[in-house]
Structures are given as structure tokens and as C-alpha cells.
Amino acid sequence: FVNYCEGIYVGYKFYETAAAEGLIDYDKVVQYPFGYGLSYTTFDSSIAAVEDDGEKITLDVAVKNTGDTAGKYVAEIFYEPPYYNGGIEKATANLVQYAKTEILQPGEAQTLKITFRYEDMASYDSNGIKSANGAYVLEAGDYKINLCSDSHTILDTYVAKVDKDVIYDDAHDGARSTDQVAATNQLTFAQGDVTYLSRADGFANYAEATAAPANHSLSAQALADYASAATFDAAKYDDPNAVMPTTGANNGLKLADLAGVAYDDPKWEQLLDELTVNDLFSLTADGGYHTVGVESIGLSATEDCDGPTGVHSNYNPAAGPSYPGSVMLACTWNQPLAKARGEQIAKECAEINCAGWYAPAMNIHRSAFGGRNFEYYSECGVLSGLTAAAEVSGATENGLICYVKHFAFNDQDNYRQNNICTWLNEQAAREIYLKAFEQPIKAGGMGVMTSMNAVGPVWAGGCKALLTNILRDEWGFHGAVITDAVVSPWYMDGNLAIRTGGTKMLAFNITNEFYRDLNSVGTVTAMRNAAHGTLYALANSFAVTRAVSVPKWVKTTYAVDAVVAIILVAWEVCAICKYRKAKKEDEGTEQ
């Protein structure tokens, strides 16, 4: 197990807040603040103007190159919310948005427009201080909007005033504008009996919260919640009143007919009726680096590929070039560059018929010892999320399904294949770890890969609270949810995955025993729902729409090859004819 005992105080959020509370001497502990960067030149920047309508804030940030060398500048916007001792936990520095200039020559200036919503500064009240069942809360008070060169160095400030609490729940002010339903506590079972770090009274519980765990046993409730192939009980998930869905119908629809059609359009039910039980089984169970073809609906088989640093495949030798690691991309603080990488990845995938990309990887640099930190963007959920949203948008707009991974709380690799239990409170889950996934999903992402670890006692790939309640119901996600590689089938159970929000298994060596009762109403219904998500993603990918055209250089190469081939054939024909003519003349002379 692993305890996220630090709560929301991850990375710079701890160091900045701990220094403000007098727990640490910042200059003795921190060498380079988060967001720090070097340049060959110098810049002046300030907040030149502010538009504030009470719903969103737009800053005009004036930047001027005051040095002797051309360069770019990043305007970083952090906010410091009002904190009330013993109340909702809040860090003193929180990245909310950023922008980067073009290349500025010496003496050249540029004004950046940076916009964000008030609700982006809300904190999640998992302890029911302001909302009984948990909610995002924008507490009354002064919010310092700081233009910074890094998390510690403030260059200019605008103070936004909130006159009264805004509570984003059904009993008060309704859901946030980006949510389909109001967020409420969904992950209480993952909190466990851990003591979480609190800012109250100047981090008075620091020693207790950071001490070695005293308890190494699951509670009775955690044992009851624990799920595996051995403990799976379909009755906990299946509707006893459900009737067997229609299968094998001849409705004359093809998947291409559903491109661009809304997820809940009745046409989808007609298409799903055409699938046989074997089709449903193959689409959901046989998902290792590919999606099977289904002739009856005109779906050709497609491939999926890894990973965050480029187009790589264990089964297709036509891999693309490797790119710098995602952490390097995040270090550029350059959203247009991230989008361009997504666009290029999509084009490379289209050339080798890979409709799915197992990337980007969204987990957090919780510590420097993360085994796959090079795949992940940052210690900051917002920087990770904004970078990924740009990259995923670039890829999705060009027809590629991005399976953002590993959903969720997979921030170490040791024991992950042994169903390691991750214990954390819901405020940390939502403000740090899920924030990174939330932004690319809400930007139009069509795919998710779950993780091997457990959320508290529940495998992430079979966690309804995560895959249905948060991902689908709250964030409005429609698409494909694949498991991580099924290397531990004793707990990575397909029966559970397809009933809790998963759509296909990254599995191999599939047999008919993969699901307990393949022909039961519950299993067929679950497979149908799962196939809907996968097919919806494919219908809006270049697997069907071919949104990404063949590059011009490929077309040119084909044309040149064809012309050269024609010339060579013509030359060969002429050579043969000339040879035969000469031979006949020689034979005539001999006679």
C-alpha cells in the first residue's frame, strides 16, 4: 500500500505554504522554485489591464524584452486563496493559467491575454465543512491573482473579491459550468485511516502525518469493499429485471453512418442490435493493442500503439520517431507546441493504421523517485492538464483516439502489478491527481486507460466511482476505456471492468471463459454498453472518418514511383523488342 499522507500539499504547494506558515526556511530548502527558468535575456512584465465580470477574469500581461538577445517569456498566473484556520485545506500558491510570448527581439513588446474562470479557483470540500456531501467551494474573501516568474517570485498582483461563499452543489449554486452534474464525494472509501497533513495551526500535525504507518492491515470495511476475480459477484452489479438485448439484427446500418452522431442518439441502439454475442465478446475482451474488425457493421480491424514519447508498437515494425519525454514538453510551458506534437502523432498513426495511442501519460511527479516520471508531465495537476489538453486536442482533431493514462493514482511502479492499494483523501484526488485527467477529457478526449493499482481497496479498472460516477456522469465523457495490460488476471477481472465503466481489456490469449457467463443477460448487457463506448470513439476517429489525409509527400512519392515504373517498363519493352529484332536480322544473315 501507499499513503498519500501529504494531501493536497504536493511539490511546490507544500514548500510555498510551509514557508508561509513558518514550518520551513524557504531559502535553505528550495534551490529552484517550480516554474523557474533561465534566459539569455531579461524581461519586464506587468498586469496592464484586467477584465473581471464576476464569472471569469482576463488579464492583459504586458511583456517587454529589456535585454540584448531575442527570447520568449512565460507569464505564469498563480492565485492565493483566502484560508480560514481549520477549514478547507488551501495552498498559498496555485497555478491557474499561463501563456508564452512569441520570440521577442531586444526592445520588442507583446501583450498576452490570459483568461480563467472564478470556479477554477474553487477548492474541494471533501470533509463536508460547507457542503454535507462534498462539493467544490469558492469561499468568500480576497483572492490574490499573482503574475509570477515562478511559484515564489511575484511580479504583480490583482485582487479579486468574492463577497459570499459559492458552493457548487445542488443545494446551493449548482454544478460548475464545465461539469454535467455537481461533484460530490465519490471516493470516501479510499481515504482509509490515514492521518493527512493539514495547514491548521501552522501544520501542527506535521510530525504525526509524516510518521511511518502504524497500521498494515485492511479494515473490515476495506476487506468488504475489496474486489477480485475470486470475489466477483454479478448480482452486485446486474439489474435483476433486465431483459436480454437484441443481437444479430439486420438493420442495415454501418459504423460509418454513426460518425458525428450523438452518443445517446437512437441510431446507436439500432447499430448495437446488429452485433452478435461473439462480436460483443471480441470487441470487449480482445483489446490488446488492437480493436477487432466487425464485418457486419463495416468496421475494419485497427491497431493501437504506445506511448508518450512517440508512435511505438510491439506488433508493427513501422514505428515513428521518438520525441523528447513529456516532462520536457511540459518544461516548455508552450501549449501550441504541445498541440503541434499531438497533430504530428496523429498523422504518424494514420500512416500505419493505428487508431489508438496509449498516451499521454497523466500521472503526477509525486516524488522524484517515480519509476516513469519521464512519461509524466509535472508535479502540478494544472500544468499537466493544460499541456495534455493541448496535445490531446491536436491529436483528436486529426482523428486519433488518445488513451490518457494511467487512470488514476498510479504514481509509483513498485508493486503496481500486485494491486497495490493507494490511500488518499478526495480533496487531493480531485485537486491534484484527477485534475490532470479532467482537462484533456473535457477538451474532447475520447479514450482513457485505467491503472493496475487499487483506489483504496478497489482496482482502478473496476472502480465504478471513478469510471462512471466521476468520468462519465460528472465530466461527461463518452468514449473508450481500456485497462492497462492484464498481467494479473487474479484481480484485473473483465467481468468487473465491463460492469463499472470499462469498455475493453488490454488482454491476450482470450478464451470463452474470459467472462463467467457469456450468455447471461447481465454479461451481454454489460458487453453491449462497453462496445457502445469503444465504437463511439472509433466512429469519430480516422478509423472511420479518415479525417487525416495521406500527407502530400506520400502522394508525391507514389506518383513519382508510378511514373518511374512506367518508364522502366517501357524501356524494358523497347529493349526486348530491339533485342528480338536484332536476333531475327542475325538469323537472316546466317541463312
Regions found by a protein language model. Name each.
Residues 153-176:
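Short beta-strand elements
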Residues 1-132, 136-151, 173-591:
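Glycoside hydrolase catalytic-domain context in secreted enzymes
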